[in-house]
From Swiss-Prot:
Belongs to the ZapD family. Pfam families: ZapD (PF07072). The gene is zapD. Cell division factor that enhances FtsZ-ring assembly. Directly interacts with FtsZ and promotes bundling of FtsZ protofilaments, with a reduction in FtsZ GTPase activity. It comes from Serratia proteamaculans (strain 568). It comes from the Bacteria. Keywords: Cell cycle, Cell division, Cytoplasm, Septation. This is Cell division protein ZapD. InterPro entries: ZapD, ZapD_C, ZapD_sf. GO terms for cellular component: cell division site; cytoplasm.
Amino acid sequence: MSDVSPSVLFEHPLNEKMRTWLRMEFLLQQLHGQRALSETAIALTFFRTVADLLDVLERGEVRTELLKELERQQQKLLAWADVPGVDMSLVDQLRNQLKQRGAALMSAPRLGQSLREDRLISLVRQRLSIPGGCCSFDLPTLHMWMHAPQQERDDDVANWQQTLEPLNQALTMVLDLIRQSGQFRNQISLNGFFQDNAEGADLLRLRINLAHQLYPQISGHKTRYAIRFLPLDSELGVVPERLTFELACC
């Protein structure tokens, strides 16, 4: 039996573009985790997630920001060329992958447009804000779709997910590289409080021992951040005077 206590990972964005990317990642992971929409409740969860993602995509220049970041990551990799002992074949491989992700994202139609234009998604999306608004008498189209053969529904879901692949692949690679750019280091909070300089970071990643039953309340931006640890049990929980946790600035 392992004597290593489990930990909980928290991530906090330090700017608006990272906030948007993390939300998109969260929604895309949910969409790709739902394959067989065998029941209406499962299907409605899927359609709500699609609607949420479309709302996020409509708020900003998602494609432009991702393309800029893909280019920035390529430039960062170029800097490794002058470092002795670096595996340049791996660096070149990553740069080629970044170029491919960028080209696919650039050539893709307007992000989410095919989902917006899909008749079933559009009908369901219009009714989601109404409590109980997706009943069979409100949405007979959805009711009929749920009675179609499972394979037909699976094919529809796969086609919808496929339209998001240029976004999903670019976003996944960008976030992977950003997360890998920061190493976890042990830190100590005093009386539940910790603050430091962000040094131009985009993302804070924080690991806390689950046994403490604490969660972080983080505020910050690209130059400075502050963390306050709060007990999950607001009445009986205790925050140690000195708390060791792991922190990575990415």
